Amino acid sequence: ARARKVNTVVVGRDGRLSGPELSRALMEGICASGVDVADIGMVPTPLGYFAAHHLKTGSAVMVTGSHNPPDYNGFKIMLGGDTLHSTAITALRTRLVEGRLAGGNGNIRQVDVRQDYLERIVSDVKLSRKMKIVVDCGNGVAGAVAPELFRRMGCELVELYCDVDGNFPNHHPDPSKPDNLKDVIRALQETDAELGLAFDGDGDRLGVVTRDGEIIYPDRQLMLFAADVLARNPGAQILYDVKCSRNLARSIRHQGGKPLMWMTGHALIKAKLKETGAPLAGEMSGHIFFADRF
């Protein structure tokens, strides 16, 4: 961090049981290198990125196992506005193993940015009418934010597993697997809700189900998002990963955009998004990246 002239790093964590211990050790290590920490607590990964911009640090580490099994955990790292991946990660590991670390005495401060995050979204995204929706957080950390967000947007909710529990006792929080959407589909059949939304363990991937129980896979979601984004950004590039349907490229061209296929991996997609200045990108895994108004 200091090599990139970073003075403060935001640190957040998802709801996994090992999160408090790992995040505490991480923050102590960051402080021992002379860098300050803004501790934002247990939050979804998108809120961590928001905090890095909102607090003007440009740097954040999310302690998260994403969609992996409950006993897994790890770090998603952004320093100086860049998400670390590939050789940058291996170089960091080498530096840690060799003990080539800076010394210092940073400070930790607790910061609550949830209300700022919610207000940013609610002030920007306006629904044309009220909706009743099913929200399945899979006992992941999205449950700490999503219900309040959708209610503030004017939605009536049918909540499934929105209490955060790192054991994931009901089903695994991975909406890319149809088996994990069965409860959403059942709730849609048993209620008059018109849309189902499901999140992964750290709240940065989305599953969508229609009232008829049809799963709208992420490449089809991108077709809809591209239509909206291209209406405001005619001729813009839209990025997608290699796992998406070839129909996505056709749809983007039909809407006047320029499709660009790129490598799978949220860090790789984000790096290409920054390089190209594209307003929208997405992956078949369910990661969607908006850069037009955010």
What do these predicted regions represent?
Residues 2, 6-72, 119-120, 148-209:
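N-terminal small/polar loop signature for handling phosphorylated ligands or for N-terminal nucleophile
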